[in-house]
Amino acid sequence: MANIDERLFVTLAKQLGEYKKILVGFSGGLDSSVLLHLLVNWRNQHNQKIQLRAIHIHHGLNLKADQWIEHCQLICDDWQVEFHSARVTIDARQKGIEAAARDARYQVFKSELQKDEVLVTAQHLDDQAETFLLALKRGSGPAGLASMPSIAVFADTLLLRPLLDYSRNELEKYASKHRLNWIEDDSNQDDRYDRNFLRLHIMPLLNQRWSHFPKAAARSASLCGEQEQLLDELLNESLKELITQDGALGIVSLAVCSEAKRNALLRRWFGYHGMKMPSREQLNRLWYEVALARTDAEPRLQFGKYDVRRYKQKLWLVPQWQSLRETILEWDICNTLVLPDRLGELNIADRGIQVRVPADNERVTIRFGVQGMISIVGRQHSRHSKKLWQELGVAPWLRERIPLLYYNEQLIAALGVFVTKESEAAEGRKMLTMNWHKTLLK
């Protein structure tokens, strides 16, 4: 059997052979120290053209964190690796420290990656087994139980984990052989954290009883990943048929699916939008409280910073925008008006809606969220605002996002949608053409 050095080099060649720019997540601990040492040797022995960079994240959670940066800097200087560090602030109020720290790390990785550069991290076989058990604890399905893939799409590039098939014990042997120095994070002994609890108390028992357990758990994770990939392939065409150009999901076709297929399609719809996978309970609530709500209702269900809404027999993922109902903007129509909340800007242009020029005593303002009866050009009778929006096909969540042009207290137009009869000019009077340049609406 090949020694650990040879096996690791073969793994690196398989995963990294074609990549010339590599960013390494470098904590200074055992795992990432082994990974960086391997990459440096691989660069030196096999491909001098490789651009190797290391990034260290200062989480601000340990009094020794500043010393760890110095340690990592010295290692990188000695190994001739370009070194970067970044400080992050951890907000553990919603997710807990472990998840919040991980999210913060990967946000830094995402912002630090350069063009054509791949990210390489040092998770190993024991990490994979722990991740599998944590997913099992949460009641995850195949997608969660698949744990960490060795290669994944990340930030328009790839995230590679070349050590996933190697145990911590093997990495320790490699580090000892090459006399590596690494950081020991004392917080790893705090079993209040779930992963540490597994590592300190559960994994030793499992390994003592079944020495093959980490490999078996990793194999199960891999099989779950294969099942999830197969489902993706089988459901891809169905999902394409259900999703509209606006990213909404058709309810009628979903209704004839089995519950299992419907839930699988709903999960993939969330994935299509880059959202976290919903739980079984959330899927049930989404279907029965939103999709199947009574026809005259305007149901919504919150998912993080988004709401799932129903409109025209489709499900929509809608950002939770700030209310603009109380917003009143003065507008000197000679100048461009920048709208709030990234809605774009208004100006006088060659194309757009036409309205009369305001009188000298008329104050021009932009408001949001009209209520009451409205009489628009092209309609004989006035309509209540809610009824009018419905007739014009404007989704409920967009109605408060459309700029309303007022002269004094008189509604003149909803930009891009309608003009009222009060917008019409007397014969011979000048007209203005107003344009709404939209940057974000849906």
Swiss-Prot record:
Its EC number is 6.3.4.19. SMART domains: TilS_C. CDD domains: TilS_N (cd01992). Keywords: ATP-binding, Cytoplasm, Ligase, Nucleotide-binding, tRNA processing. It catalyses: cytidine(34) in tRNA(Ile2) + L-lysine + ATP = lysidine(34) in tRNA(Ile2) + AMP + diphosphate + H(+). Gene3D superfamilies: 1.20.59.20, HUPs. It is an enzyme of class 6 (ligase). One of its GO terms (biological process) is tRNA modification. It is found in: Cytoplasm. ATP binds at residues 27-32. One of its GO terms (molecular function) is ATP binding. Pfam families: ATP_bind_3, TilS, TilS_C. GO terms for cellular component: cytoplasm. Belongs to the tRNA(Ile)-lysidine synthase family. Ligates lysine onto the cytidine present at position 34 of the AUA codon-specific tRNA(Ile) that contains the anticodon CAU, in an ATP-dependent manner. Cytidine is converted to lysidine, thus changing the amino acid specificity of the tRNA from methionine to isoleucine. The N-terminal region contains the highly conserved SGGXDS motif, predicted to be a P-loop motif involved in ATP binding. This is tRNA(Ile)-lysidine synthase. It comes from Photorhabdus laumondii subsp. laumondii (strain DSM 15139 / CIP 105565 / TT01).
